[in-house]
Curated annotation (Swiss-Prot):
Protein name in UniProt: Aspartate carbamoyltransferase catalytic subunit
Classification via PANTHER family: ASPARTATE CARBAMOYLTRANSFERASE, ORNITHINE CARBAMOYLTRANSFERASE, MITOCHONDRIAL
GO BP term, example: 'de novo' pyrimidine nucleobase biosynthetic process
The organism of origin for this protein: Afipia carboxidovorans (strain ATCC 49405 / DSM 1227 / KCTC 32145 / OM5) (Oligotropha carboxidovorans)
The organism's place on the tree of life at top rank: Bacteria
Segments traversing the membrane: none
Residues given in the record as L-aspartate binding sites: K94, R177, R231
Stated role: Catalyzes the condensation of carbamoyl phosphate and aspartate to form carbamoyl aspartate and inorganic phosphate, the committed step in the de novo pyrimidine nucleotide biosynthesis pathway.
Family named by the database record: Belongs to the aspartate/ornithine carbamoyltransferase superfamily. ATCase family.
Pathway where it operates: Pyrimidine metabolism; UMP biosynthesis via de novo pathway; (S)-dihydroorotate from bicarbonate: step 2/3
Length: 317
């Protein structure tokens, strides 16, 4: 086992349900702790014992590969007993309600529940029924706090700061919990945020969240330090939000020409999974300015930091 992190940060919240409600100090503390875990994860011995004897349940009502795997790796590296539970193998398929599931799981005394659900607000409702700590791994189009934190860590490590940077968030903002969490975090940390996309994919009144709005990529990427592309979420669309994937790419997909509208040293991000040829082309996604793979690495470190920060609030911690 490796030595404990130098950071003594304790999150002043029992759960992590969203970025909303966190302070700038909370975010800085989590990012600092996560930075220590980045270095740990690059060593041969990646294990710590901070969650030894604790049970972590990953409860995913929506399919996930990278987020669920990231939380599983994070928990195991911290020494937790990790159980993965998907809706396809659960009693929810047999008619059990979300609250029944929460009460049933609570009777098994898990210490930490990591929950993803297709309905906005569902994770908060579940958190009211359990005694352990709950981490929101994405709820509908509401929030995805650990994604915003890992994005912030990625930006900070590459640009040295968040304050004063211009972040262009491009694409399907309307259906994106990633966009919402990032907007809240980046505003809180002093960055400028500009959302870019067709009017059909931008929430009405989004200016009230303190962002700039652009409806074409040339204007939207002008002066951008970071270009954050979003997946076109057709599974959440009930109508014709865009004419076709090819036409969408023509106007809003990121290629080398559109990337040239941003600053010369601009960096590219994407929360994944990527639809290559729809919101981003392979040359940019795999190019020298892309941080996509680094985001995945930062995700494990951030989730380790979140789990440890919450564990420090658990009884007998």
């Amino acid at each position: 086992m490796t030595s404990a992190p130098k950071s003594s940060f304790v999150l002043g919240h029992r759960h992590l349900l969203g970025i909303e409600g966190l302070s700038a100090a909370d975010i800085t503390g989590l990012l600092d702790l996560a930075g220590e875990y980045v270095e740990l994860n690059r060593q041969v011995d990646k294990k710590r014992s901070v969650l030894r004897g604790r049970t972590q349940v990953n409860l995913f009502f929506e399919a996930s590969t990278r987020t669920q795997s990231s939380f599983e790796i994070a928990g195991k590296r911290l020494g937790a007993d990790v159980m993965n539970m998907s809706v396809s193998s659960s009693s929810m398929r047999k008619g059990e309600t979300l609250m029944d599931t929460a009460v049933t799981l609570n009777a098994m005394h898990p210490d930490i529940l990591v929950v993803r659900h297709h309905a906005s607000g569902a994770v908060e409702l579940l958190a009211r029924k359990v005694d352990g700590s709950v981490v929101n791994a994405g709820d509908g189009a509401h929030e995805h706090p650990t994604q915003a934190l890992l994005d912030a860590l990625t930006i900070r490590r590459n640009k040295g700061r968040l304050e004063g940077l211009l972040i262009a968030i491009c694409g399907d903002v309307l259906h994106s919990r990633v966009a919402r969490s990032n907007i809240i975090l980046l505003n809180l940390m002093g960055a400028r945020v500009r959302v870019v996309g067709p009017s059909t994919l931008l929430p009405p009144g989004i200016e009230r969240m303190g962002v700039e709005v652009a409806h074409d990529m040339r204007e939207g990427l002008d002066g951008a330090d970071i270009v954050m592309m979003l997946r076109l979420q057709r599974e959440r669309m009930s109508g014709s939000f865009v004419p076709s994937s090819s036409e969408y790419f023509q106007f809003f997909g990121l290629d080398q020409k559109k990337l040239s509208y941003a600053k010369p040293d601009a960096l590219v991000m994407h929360p994944g999974p990527m639809n290559r040829g729809v919101e981003i082309d392979s040359i940019v996604a795999d190019g020298a300015q892309s941080l996509v793979r680094e985001q995945v690495e930062m995700g494990v470190a951030v989730r380790m930091a979140v789990l440890e920060a919450l564990a420090r609030n658990l009884p007998n911690a």
